[in-house]
Amino acid sequence: MPATAETASYRLNHVMIRIKDPKASLDFYENVLGMDVIDKHDGGDFTLYFLAYQHQKVAQRGEREAILELTHNHGTENDPNFSYHNGNQEPRGFGHLCVAVDDIQKACDRFERLGVKFQKKLTDGKMRNIAFILDPDNYWIEIISTSRPQ
């Protein structure tokens, strides 16, 4: 069903994933993927971090699109056996995030230099126009080109 007058102003504001160690996750999303923390909320036994790309210069968090919310439940970082289910093993569920880049080869070369773990490199498999990297919690992040053929 196409958008109607009632839904024309709707937009996807954010997606939330749970993280084990905020230091590792913030380092990854800020320094590997170039996102900025635009807001933070301390909720007692948990902390919420809201990250976005700064090219969308809107002051209010609610007016932005494509925000990533990282939820850290305090104490998980101290448990070496703790991990979150990333949705890509049984039982399957959540699949991946996706980041578009201007030059996918250059981005993947940079990820290699930074020691980022890959789930799928550009040279793997039949789909040679996408890659998948892994964040510190093993969430998959698809990397596509902004000029990717449709």
Predicted feature residues:
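Active-site ExK catalytic segment of metal-dependent nucleases
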Residues: 71-73, 144
